[in-house]
Amino acid sequence: MSHRDTLFSAPIARLGDWTFDERVAEVFPDMIQRSVPGYSNIISMISMLAERFVQPGTQVYDLGCSLGAATLSVRRNIHHDNCKIIAIDNSPAMIERCRRHIDAYKAPTPVDVIEGDIRDIAIENASMVVLNFTLQFLEPSERQALLDKIYQGLNPGGALVLSEKFSFEDAKVGELLFNMHHDFKRANGYSELEISQKRSMLENVMLTDSVETHKARLHKAGFEHSELWFQCFNFGSLVALKAEDAV
């Protein structure tokens, strides 16, 4: 059962950097719903994308799976035989709960839940890959290599779903959407102290990119088509397609 996120409701003397530890994992469903505008829409639409792109006899990768929300969404709309989902996260606390969540919902498509580093996982025979608010936690210098690996592991006609928090090249727009995001969190019951403390912990570990930067990386990796398909304030999701005639 998910608990309400009150992790930052009292002053913390030494904040440190953000980690996806046991305390975060325990309140994560509540935290992400109250912090990420449009999160439920993205999860629901990932299921629709899976129905369109997952092919028989292929694999789906959920890289940075957290508690498995995207994995479960994908699995609901897989109607082919011999498919498998591989869900990976480097947080032991997240993986422990993810396994419980996956096991609670029976379905014919098997799921391998792996505790590991997504940079070390081989991507093979993939028809769909999901990076749901994950890339932003990698060092910027490591992001291109991961996208290159995903492109190489995708079958022709495959899709990558890349959801992220965005920065903006237009400072005025960036400021507006930043403030609207904070209004969203206030409306969901977070205090100024909670918002400030969480932001301080995240600022050194979550480094955001613009949509233009994401699209440039995807093009460099080999994706012929990529576009923003969902956005709410400074959060959104892109889909990148590998050409059906790609070698």
Swiss-Prot record:
Binding site for S-adenosyl-L-methionine: Y39, G64, C65, S66, D89, N90, D117, I118, N132, R199
InterPro entries cross-referenced by the UniProt entry: CmoA, Methyltransf_25, SAM-dependent_MTases_sf
Protein keywords: S-adenosyl-L-methionine, Transferase
GO terms for MF: carboxyl- or carbamoyltransferase activity; S-adenosyl-L-methionine binding
Cited Gene3D superfamilies: Vaccinia Virus protein VP39 (3.40.50.150)
PANTHER family (UniProt xref): CARBOXY-S-ADENOSYL-L-METHIONINE SYNTHASE, TRANS-ACONITATE 2-METHYLTRANSFERASE-RELATED
Cited function: Catalyzes the conversion of S-adenosyl-L-methionine (SAM) to carboxy-S-adenosyl-L-methionine (Cx-SAM).
Protein's recorded name: Carboxy-S-adenosyl-L-methionine synthase
Species this chain originates from: Shigella boydii serotype 18 (strain CDC 3083-94 / BS512)
